[in-house]
């Protein structure tokens, strides 16, 4: 399927440019331009996708909300063991509040709701325990922010002013190292967050690198709001939590080595971001369906 970009497309695209492009909106275009057209331009959803993803999205929202509330009181301070004693006491109350926010009764969850409840609790416990282990092993952990909304206005060549935005799940400082972290309820591996250092363009060409694109865009946004010299950016996947924090990395042979986000990385990402937005606005490039 091929769709030509008509005036109505550009009118809606300009609205998005004013309200803001998110990482998920841009990676939906990378995944399949026709899906981007349907969801962002026409604002309709594939009901099969909605049905498939609703449980995962609900659980993800519950975990994010609960962790946000659990850590919010401790933002900006060095965490100690006593803090985790209090966090653990608040685990069930905050989980129930997060559950109610998703319009799910917690009085006696059954069936799929019971599974969502128990799995959410399991992941929250693992996350808190992981942080406690760091502290007990002598690491200095400071939560700088949770659920941080970032936005910025950028000037894209040939396009003009465009707004971008994103919600960063967690920004912390571990033994002095700034970390920009995105939580994922689905599985993630190093290959999803790593790229060949000579091929930044893969970020806008291969949806398998969507997670790398996301953490780089969060880093780019953060740098525009709070400039930094270097930072680590990565994923914590609840599905394969045992892998721990999975940072953005460069491919080195058959393995991946963590790459700190510095000025050069941000400049390379900016070029990819600009080119992707320019493609969206290019009337000569039609929307062509990709196999998903």
Where are these regions (language model features)?
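RecB-family 4Fe-4S metal-dependent nuclease core
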Residues: 1-292
């Amino acid at each position: 399927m091929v769709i030509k970009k008509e005036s109505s497309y550009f009118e809606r695209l300009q609205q998005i440019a004013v309200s803001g492009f998110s990482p998920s909106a841009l990676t939906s275009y990378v995944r399949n331009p026709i899906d981007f057209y349907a969801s962002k331009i026409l604002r309709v959803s594939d009901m099969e996708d909605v049905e498939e993803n609703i449980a995962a999205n609900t659980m993800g929202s519950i975990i994010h909300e609960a962790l946000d509330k659990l850590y919010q009181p401790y933002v900006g301070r060095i965490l100690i063991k006593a803090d985790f004693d209090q966090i653990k006491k608040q685990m069930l109350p905050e989980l129930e509040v997060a559950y109610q926010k998703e319009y799910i009764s917690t009085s006696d969850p059954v069936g799929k709701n019971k599974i969502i409840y128990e799995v959410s609790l399991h992941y929250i416990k693992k996350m808190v325990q992981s942080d406690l282990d760091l502290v007990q092993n002598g690491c200095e952990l400071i939560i700088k922010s949770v659920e941080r909304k970032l936005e910025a206005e950028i000037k894209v060549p040939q396009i003009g002013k465009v707004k971008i935005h994103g919600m960063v799940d967690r920004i912390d400082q571990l033994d002095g190292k700034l970390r920009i972290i995105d939580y994922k309820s689905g599985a993630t591996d190093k290959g999803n967050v790593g790229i060949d250092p000579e091929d930044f363009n893969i970020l806008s060409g291969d949806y398998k690198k969507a997670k790398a694109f996301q953490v780089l865009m969060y880093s780019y946004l953060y740098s525009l709001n709070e400039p930094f010299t270097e930072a680590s950016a990565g994923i914590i996947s609840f599905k394969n939590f045992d892998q721990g924090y999975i940072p953005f990395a460069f491919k080195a042979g058959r393995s991946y080595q963590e790459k700190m986000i510095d000025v050069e990385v941000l400049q390379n990402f900016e070029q990819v971001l600009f080119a992707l937005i320019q493609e969206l606005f290019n009337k000569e490039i039609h929307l062509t369906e990709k196999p998903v």
